[in-house]
């Protein structure tokens, strides 16, 4: 990716995040966070990775369907904000970024391992005390 393409990706990420926060926060429930963006070399498509803080998979899927249906509207708002900074306004494609959920899953796994280790140490001490 060229430096220009990277800059456009950063600009698109920042501006789409602002648009979602300011213009769509009331319509997009649960909260949506744009975690990263990637733009094709010809600037025709921006791949936006989003994390959705929903309680259920159904909520998250519904939010992504809503994002997809709003993509053209969001692109028009993006165009009005960045038209003077870029040659072409990319088409927006939203994808689910599972990295935050994966990090949370790993953290929970480490917590369970730590708890199991502590329990085994306590059980080991208890059985050592019983032998004395």
From Swiss-Prot:
SUPFAM superfamilies: Ribosome-binding factor A, RbfA
UniProt keyword annotation of Membrane present: no
Highest rank taxon of the organism: Bacteria
Keywords: Cytoplasm, Ribosome biogenesis
Gene3D superfamilies: 3.30.300.20
Transmembrane segments annotated in the record for this chain: none
Cell location: Cytoplasm
GO cellular component: cytosol
Xref: InterPro entries: KH_dom-like_a/b, RbfA, RbfA_dom_sf
GO biological process: maturation of SSU-rRNA
GO molecular function, one term: ribosomal small subunit binding
Subunit composition and interactions: Monomer. Binds 30S ribosomal subunits, but not 50S ribosomal subunits or 70S ribosomes.
PANTHER family: RIBOSOME-BINDING FACTOR A, CHLOROPLASTIC-RELATED
NCBIfam families in the record: rbfA (TIGR00082)
Role noted for this protein: One of several proteins that assist in the late maturation steps of the functional core of the 30S ribosomal subunit. Associates with free 30S ribosomal subunits (but not with 30S subunits that are part of 70S ribosomes or polysomes). Required for efficient processing of 16S rRNA. May interact with the 5'-terminal helix region of 16S rRNA.
Assigned protein family: Belongs to the RbfA family.
Protein name per its UniProtKB record: Ribosome-binding factor A
């Amino acid at each position: 990716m060229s430096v220009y393409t990277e800059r456009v990706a950063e600009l698109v990420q920042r501006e789409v995040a602002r648009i979602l926060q300011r213009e769509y926060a009331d319509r997009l429930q649960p909260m949506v966070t744009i975690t990263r963006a990637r733009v094709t070399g010809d600037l025709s498509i921006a791949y936006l990775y989003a994390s959705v803080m929903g309680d259920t998979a159904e909520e998250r899927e519904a939010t992504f369907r809503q994002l997809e249906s709003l993509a053209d509207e969001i692109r028009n708002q993006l165009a009005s904000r960045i038209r003077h900074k870029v040659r072409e306004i990319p088409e927006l494609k939203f994808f689910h970024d599972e990295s935050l959920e994966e990090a949370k899953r790993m953290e929970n796994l480490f917590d369970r391992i730590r708890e199991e280790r502590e329990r085994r140490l306590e059980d080991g001490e208890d059985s050592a005390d019983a032998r004395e």
